[in-house]
C-alpha cells in the first residue's frame, strides 16, 4: 500500500465493516451497552444494503457467550478468537481475498482492549481505520476516552455512524440512498460521547 498520507475517504467497494465482540457477558459491564449495540446494528443494516463485507468476532464465546441477538447478525459468520486483536490469521486471510480493500470501519468493545489492538494491527498493515466512536465503548469512560485519543495519535480516523454512512453513499443519487436514509432519519442513540469532552481534548494535536 502507498505510504503517502491519506485523508480517509471512504468508498463502499473498498471498505469492510468490523463488529467486535458484542457478546452477552458484556451486557451488564459495558457503559452504554444497549446504545452501542443499537448504533452497531444500524451500521450492519446499512452495510448489508450496500453489500459491504462484514467481519464479526467473538472473544472466547464459551466463557463470554454469543453475540447479542439485537445486533441482527444471526445469519453471519462469527470468527472466534482469544487474542485482543480481531486480525487473526483467519480474518487476515479473508481480508486478502477482498479486491481493492483500503478501509476498515471499526465498531465494538472494549475500546481500550480489542478495538485499540485491532486498530493498531490494521494500521500497521497499511489500512485506513475509521473508528466509529458512537459504536465503541468500555467498562470505564476514562478508558474509552484515552483509547480513542491513543488511536487518533496512531493515525486512526475518529468518526460517527452517520458520518460514515453518508460518506459511503457520497451522493443523494446513490441507488441505495433512500434505503440507507431510512436508517439514519432517526438520530442515533446517545452513547455518552458528549460527557467525554470534559476530559482531554480528542482533537488536540
From Swiss-Prot:
Signal peptide: none annotated. Coiled coil: none annotated. SUPFAM superfamilies: Isochorismatase-like hydrolases. The lineage of its organism: Eukaryota, Metazoa, Chordata, Craniata, Vertebrata. One of its GO terms (cellular component) is cytoplasm. The gene is isoc2. InterPro entries: Isochorismatase-like_dom, Isochorismatase-like_sf, Isochorismatase_domain. Gene3D superfamilies: Isochorismatase-like. This is Isochorismatase domain-containing protein 2. Belongs to the isochorismatase family. It comes from the Eukaryota.
Amino acid at each position: 500500500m502507498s505510504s503517502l498520507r491519506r485523508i480517509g475517504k471512504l468508498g463502499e467497494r473498498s471498505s469492510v465493516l468490523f463488529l467486535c465482540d458484542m457478546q452477552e457477558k458484556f451486557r451488564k459491564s459495558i457503559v452504554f451497552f444497549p446504545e452501542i449495540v443499537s448504533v452497531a446494528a444500524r451500521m450492519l443494516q446499512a452495510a448489508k444494503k450496500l453489500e459491504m463485507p462484514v467481519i464479526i468476532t467473538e472473544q472466547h464465546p464459551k466463557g463470554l457467550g454469543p453475540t447479542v441477538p439485537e445486533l441482527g447478525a444471526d445469519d453471519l459468520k462469527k470468527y472466534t478468537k482469544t487474542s485482543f486483536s480481531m486480525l487473526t490469521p483467519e480474518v487476515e486471510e479473508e481480508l486478502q481475498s477482498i479486491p481493492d480493500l483500503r478501509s476498515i470501519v471499526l465498531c465494538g468493545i472494549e475500546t481500550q482492549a480489542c478495538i485499540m489492538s485491532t486498530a493498531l494491527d490494521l494500521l500497521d498493515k497499511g489500512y485506513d481505520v475509521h473508528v466509529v466512536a458512537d459504536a465503541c465503548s468500555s467498562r470505564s469512560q476514562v478508558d474509552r476516552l484515552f483509547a480513542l485519543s491513543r488511536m487518533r495519535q496512531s493515525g486512526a480516523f475518529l468518526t460517527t455512524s452517520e458520518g460514515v454512512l453518508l460518506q459511503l453513499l457520497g451522493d443523494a443519487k446513490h441507488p441505495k440512498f433512500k434505503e440507507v436514509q431510512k436508517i439514519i432519519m432517526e438520530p442515533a442513540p446517545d452513547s455518552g460521547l458528549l460527557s467525554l469532552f470534559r476530559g482531554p481534548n480528542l482533537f488536540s494535536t
